[in-house]
């Protein structure tokens, strides 16, 4: 029945209470990613996300995604980026796109392609405005990506890095040393006072995600939220 299908879909898309880690949490991305292997899928997803949050009262958003995660059925990273920009054009929300490189094994070439696309499409506003590094932080440490971000700096690309979520404060220090002006999550800076000071002194913006931090067990108790 339709009800039954809806329940099953909800289950596939919802992080269970039994979720124990970021790696567990990331499994919920499998189905949405599968639906975004075409330009129509990506364009529609960007448009729907933007419209949805606009109706909730959000006045500005930076929608981020990893173009390399959408190439399984023959779409190129560049076509994925163009599709996202198409979706962005259709919304009334003031929004930009951030392109994510991914932590992982054997995808170095794909990350450099994302970097080159960020450079090609980079604008001040109304399109691609920066780059990010996302994915399984505990398995693939920030320290592996020095050369990638050296190149981003050389190109003058602004970037943020997911750090201090599944790995400790050292990951945040590393990201800041690479030149990240913002940190995705950063909740574990509280484990090291010197990293807290570094964040404060350099005016690093922390992009906080309290809901997912509870779901991934990056924070057990909201009293401990930095």
Task: Give, region by region, the residue ranges found by the protein language model.
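Polyampholytic, low-complexity intrinsically disordered segments
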Residues: 12-39, 131
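Divalent metal-dependent hydrolysis catalytic cores, especially in the metallo-beta-lactamase
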Residues: 24-34, 50-73, 94-100
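Hydrophobic residues within beta-strands of alpha/beta enzymes
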Residues: 61-63, 131, 183
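Glycine-rich anion/phosphate-binding loops
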Residues: 34-47, 78
């Amino acid at each position: 029945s339709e009800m039954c299908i809806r329940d099953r879909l909800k289950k596939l898309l919802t992080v269970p209470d039994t979720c124990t880690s970021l790696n567990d949490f990331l499994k919920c991305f499998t189905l949405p990613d599968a639906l975004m292997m075409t330009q129509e899928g990506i364009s529609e997803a960007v448009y729907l996300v933007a419209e949805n949050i606009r109706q909730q009262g959000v006045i500005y958003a930076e929608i981020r995604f990893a173009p390399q995660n959408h190439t399984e059925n023959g779409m190129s990273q560049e076509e994925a980026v163009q599709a996202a920009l198409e979706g962005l054009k259709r919304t009334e929300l003031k929004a930009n796109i951030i392109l994510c490189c991914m932590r992982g094994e054997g995808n170095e070439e794909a990350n450099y392609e994302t970097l080159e696309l960020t450079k090609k499409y980079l604008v001040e506003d109304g399109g691609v405005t920066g780059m990010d590094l996302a994915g399984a932080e505990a398995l693939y440490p920030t320290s592996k990506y020095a050369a990638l971000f050296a190149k981003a700096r050389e190109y003058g690309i602004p970037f943020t890095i997911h750090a201090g979520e599944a790995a400790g404060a050292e990951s945040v220090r590393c990201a800041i040393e690479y030149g990240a002006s913002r940190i995705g999550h950063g909740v574990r800076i509280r484990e090291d006072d010197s990293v807290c000071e570094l964040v404060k002194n350099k005016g690093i913006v922390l992009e906080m995600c309290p809901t997912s931090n509870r779901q991934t067990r990056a924070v057990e108790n909201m009293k401990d939220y930095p």
